[in-house]
Amino acid sequence: ATLTVFFRDN
């Protein structure tokens, strides 16, 4: 995932 979307995409 991306740095910003890490939390929800992970």
UniProtKB/Swiss-Prot annotation:
GO terms for cellular component: extracellular region. It is found in: Secreted, Cell wall. Keywords: Cell wall, Secreted. Its main location: secreted. This is 52 kDa cell wall protein. It comes from Arabidopsis thaliana (Mouse-ear cress).
